[in-house]
Amino acid sequence: MTQPNPNKQSVELNRTSLFWGLLLIFVLAVLFSSYFFN
């Protein structure tokens, strides 16, 4: 089982992890702002 282009696979994985990281930071920022400004 050899991947035709492993570089593209790692780039896709990187983009997905970056997206989830930004989403997590956004959710934490919303929670903290609602906690502080309430």
UniProtKB/Swiss-Prot annotation:
Membrane topology: Single-pass membrane protein
InterPro entries, alphabetized: PSII_PsbL (IPR003372), PSII_PsbL_sf (IPR037266)
Name the UniProt record assigns to this protein: Photosystem II reaction center protein L
Family according to the record: Belongs to the PsbL family.
GO biological-process terms attached to the record: photosynthesis
Keyword Plastid in annotation: yes
Transmembrane segments: 17-37
Subcellular location per the Swiss-Prot or TrEMBL entry: Plastid, Chloroplast thylakoid membrane
Organism placement in taxonomy: Eukaryota, Viridiplantae, Streptophyta, Zygnematophyceae, Zygnematophycidae
Superkingdom as given in the UniProt entry: Eukaryota
